[in-house]
Amino acid sequence: MDFSFALAMLGGHTDIELNTDVKLRDPVIRYVLDLFDGAPVSIFQVGGIESLQTQFRWGSGWSDTIFGAYIKEFGGSLTVADIDLDHLANSSFMSERLGYDINLELGDAIETISKDYDIYYLDGADGDLGDKQTLEQFKKIENTKSIVLIDDIKSKAVSLTKYLKSKKIKFETHHRFGNGGMITIDMRQI
């Protein structure tokens, strides 16, 4: 098992090269954070760090480490919801070692997602279940003044993109990032 990425990150390295053809989600996440111009933000993320193995860096994303670095510097809060205690333990470990605060919610995100956040990152299950969950989660926060990110469009956002089009809600597609692209929805302008 290869844990070299986690070890490098914990060692303070920031420019860590990964051998993969997958375009990491990081630029899209940073693009969204940049929209807040260094202001404190509250973030709700569905899904913690699956594994500290390097191969999970591009499939699982590790987005809470990017969000965490932002709130460490500019303030705000990060809540991560996951049904898997091991995933939350990984997220907790990284936050403790990298020095940012995190709120952990064990259970289905639909039970804890609320309208109190500036950014929502809906990154739950893949496949039919994930597609349905993503749509349900979005409907629960649809009337917020927030930015919503969803990755793995082909497995998590098929129903959501149809819903957005039917409601004439604009969204931006980032095809070359993550596994199958990402979308961002800026609900602050609606």
Enumerate the predicted regions with their spans:
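Soluble or luminal CAZymes and related metallo-dependent hydrolases
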Residues: 20-28, 59, 63, 86, ...
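Active-site segment flanking the S-adenosylmethionine/decSAM binding pocket
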Residues: 105-161
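Short, solvent-exposed loop/turn segments at secondary-structure junctions
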Residues: 48-51, 85-87, 125-127, 154-155, ...
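SAM cofactor-binding core of SAM-dependent methyltransferases
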Residues: 27-109
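Surface-exposed cleft-lining segments at the edges of enzyme active sites
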Residues: 11-19, 51-56, 122
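Class I SAM-dependent methyltransferase Rossmann-like catalytic core
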Residues: 1-40
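Short catalytic/ligand-binding loop motif for oxyanion handling, primarily in non-cytosolic enzymes
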Residues: 51-54, 87-90, 112-113, 129-130, ...
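A short, conserved beta-to-alpha structural element at the edge of catalytic cores
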Residues: 149-190
